[in-house]
């Protein structure tokens, strides 16, 4: 298995007066799951299509292992588009074998790969059905099999979990983790931010064609504000008002949620809470990726 990483270096793309991408740069390392998140129209799909070589960037380049993406490199990429990219009236098995052979596998190698991946994705019993006869979830499984059937050196997946039931989400998650553990760089976009937070090593947040933030979830948390949750049952409303660098966000499950600006003293907050009576809990609240995403795109 290749240990090549995927490098996106300063790519820009315009459509007339519309800027789709502006100096988009990031890297997906070998054996890394990279989550690519952003609102609709932020530039995720355009970036992925340029990475695959389907679209040409106006500026910048995409490299796999230091080599520009040409026809030979494209054959080594597994791509799963958000929209269905399969022939609806063609049988599943024949279609996957055809795709495998397009990527350079022999007829026998393609047959073995089709059997392996349809079994792994629990669709082996549907290989003689047409794609149009399948549920949307099973069509999504076939689409993933099409991205995997040629044993790619990098995976680029656009909304791979869309429309899947929880069992299918687990199957697909396990497959992506396995490919990652084998050294494959995996990038996928998703609006299911809880899933991205659970699976990904690093996350890139895109807004209006720009990479706004990139890093581990913990690194993204360090960029934002710190929140405290304080359970002081005897405290009157507004008990933290006036503390330097402290803003009351609200009350959640009986606990006061406070936002600390840089330089604020959490021990001063604890002392103020203790002056109101017993303090049952006092803890830093970890922001979810969904909350971090809102902070970044609203900045």
Language-model segments: which ranges?
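Alpha-helix N-cap/helix-start and coil->helix boundary motif
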Residues: 70, 93, 193, 200, ...
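C-terminal coupling/interaction segments
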Residues: 3, 261-299
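Short, flexible helix/strand-to-coil boundary loops that buttress conserved ligand/catalytic motifs
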Residues: 73, 221-224, 296-297
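ABC transporter nucleotide-binding domain
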Residues: 171-260
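Solvent-exposed beta-strand sheet faces enriched in polar/charged residues
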Residues: 9, 231, 283-285
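ABC transporter nucleotide-binding domains
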Residues: 3-6, 13-207, 213
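Structural motif
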Residues: 84, 244-247, 277
């Amino acid at each position: 298995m290749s240990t090549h990483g995927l490098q996106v270096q300063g790519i820009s793309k315009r459509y007339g007066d519309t800027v789709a991408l502006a100096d988009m740069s990031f890297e997906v390392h070998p054996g890394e799951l990279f989550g690519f998140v952003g609102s609709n129209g932020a530039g995720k799909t355009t970036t992925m299509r340029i990475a695959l070589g389907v679209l040409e960037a106006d500026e910048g380049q995409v490299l796999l292992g230091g080599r520009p993406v040409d026809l030979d490199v494209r054959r080594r990429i597994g791509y799963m588009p958000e929209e269905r990219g399969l022939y609806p009236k063609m049988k599943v098995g024949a279609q996957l074998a055809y795709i495998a052979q397009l990527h350079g596998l022999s007829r026998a190698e393609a047959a073995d790969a089709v059997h392996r991946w349809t079994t792994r994705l629990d669709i082996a019993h549907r290989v003689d059905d047409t794609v149009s006869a399948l549920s949307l979830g099973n069509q999504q499984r076939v689409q993933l099999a099409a991205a995997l059937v040629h044993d790619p050196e990098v995976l680029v997946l656009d909304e791979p979990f869309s429309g899947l039931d929880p069992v299918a989400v687990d199957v697909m998650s396990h497959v992506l983790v396995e490919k990652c553990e084998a050294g494959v760089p995996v990038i996928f976009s998703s609006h299911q931010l809880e899933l991205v937070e659970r699976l990904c090593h690093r996350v890139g947040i895109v807004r209006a064609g720009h990479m706004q933030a990139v890093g581990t979830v913990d690194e993204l948390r360090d960029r934002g504000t710190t929140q405290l949750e304080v359970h002081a049952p005897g405290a009157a409303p507004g008990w933290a008002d006036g503390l330097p660098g402290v803003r009351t966000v609200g009350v959640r499950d009986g606990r006061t949620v406070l936002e600390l600006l840089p330089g604020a003293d959490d021990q001063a907050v604890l002392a103020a809470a203790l002056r109101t009576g017993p303090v049952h809990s006092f803890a830093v609240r970890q922001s979810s990726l969904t909350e971090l995403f809102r902070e970044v795109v609203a900045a």
